[in-house]
């Protein structure tokens, strides 16, 4: 009888381990696959795709759009009549916040990375692609300020201004499965999702502590 109890315990433990193992593989925890290139021993992560199913590429222009009904694209705005606009907002389906969004480019420290594919959970810098004055030319890179607000004024190469992209399980009303969330991933700190919040009457992009709280985004080639 004792041996039967031990066997039952081992079978139950194995079953629970398999369940936990299976749950660990989802779009939130993408499987790292080996490269198909025989001369490349590096491991690669899945590609990030735009709304039309094309891989995102470093240096190309995109609109970051929230596909949910009533939501809209991300844009640069000037709050408080500053010399350089620095607020990162989200358009909404209400008159004062209607719009088409401001194009962005994803960049890395090395200019030689231009044209490379963007992969999930790899660090990138996000930069608005806008006409600007000499005074504001270095004020287009995203960062997160001390209030947890996404603003511009970051620097390419500053490890505290790194963002990453993660796949979600969401599907757009049109049926696209290429829906992602953004994360702010400063050096030596845990990544935080990018969510949304009204602050002083404006729909701001903010960091959030709850892993289940985030804004969904699709990327539209501009």
UniProtKB/Swiss-Prot annotation:
Q: What broad class describes the main subcellular location of this protein?
A: other
SUPFAM superfamilies, per database record: STI-like (SSF50386)
Pfam families from the UniProt entry: Kunitz_legume
Print the keywords alphabetically.
Disulfide bond, Protease inhibitor, Signal, Thiol protease inhibitor, Vacuole
Q: Which cysteine residues pair off into disulfide bonds?
A: 84-136, 185-191
Top-level lineage group: Eukaryota
Propeptide residue span(s)? 27-42
Give the signal peptide range.
1-26
Q: Which PANTHER family does the UniProt record give?
A: CYSTEINE PROTEASE INHIBITOR 1 (PTHR33107:SF44), KUNITZ TRYPSIN INHIBITOR 2 (PTHR33107)
Functional description taken from the UniProt entry: Putative inhibitor of cysteine proteases. Does not inhibit papain. May protect the plant by inhibiting proteases of invading organisms.
Q: What family is this protein classified in?
A: Belongs to the protease inhibitor I3 (leguminous Kunitz-type inhibitor) family.
- Protein's UniProt name: Cysteine protease inhibitor 9
């Amino acid at each position: 009888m004792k041996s039967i109890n031990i066997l039952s315990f081992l079978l139950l433990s194995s079953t629970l381990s398999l369940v936990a193992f299976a749950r660990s593989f989802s779009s939130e925890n993408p499987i790292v696959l080996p490269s198909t290139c025989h001369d490349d021993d590096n491991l690669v992560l899945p590609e990030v795709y735009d709304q039309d199913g094309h891989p995102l590429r470093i240096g190309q222009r995109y609109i970051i759009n929230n596909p949910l009904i009533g939501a809209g694209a991300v844009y640069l705005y000037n709050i408080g009549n500053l010399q350089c606009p620095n607020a990162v907002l989200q358009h909404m389906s209400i008159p004062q916040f209607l719009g088409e969004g401001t194009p962005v480019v994803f960049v890395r420290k090395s200019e030689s990375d231009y044209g490379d594919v963007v992969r999930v959970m790899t660090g990138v810098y996000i930069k608005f692609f806008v006409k600007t004055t000499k005074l504001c030319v270095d004020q287009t890179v995203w960062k997160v300020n001390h209030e947890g607000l996404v603003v511009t004024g970051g620097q390419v190469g500053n490890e505290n201004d790194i963002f990453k992209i993660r796949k979600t399980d969401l599907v757009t009303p049109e049926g696209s499965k290429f829906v992602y969330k953004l994360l702010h991933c400063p050096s030596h700190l845990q990544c935080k999702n990018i969510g949304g919040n009204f602050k002083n009457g404006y729909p701001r992009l903010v960091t959030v502590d709850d892993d289940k709280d985030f804004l969904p985004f699709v990327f539209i080639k501009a």
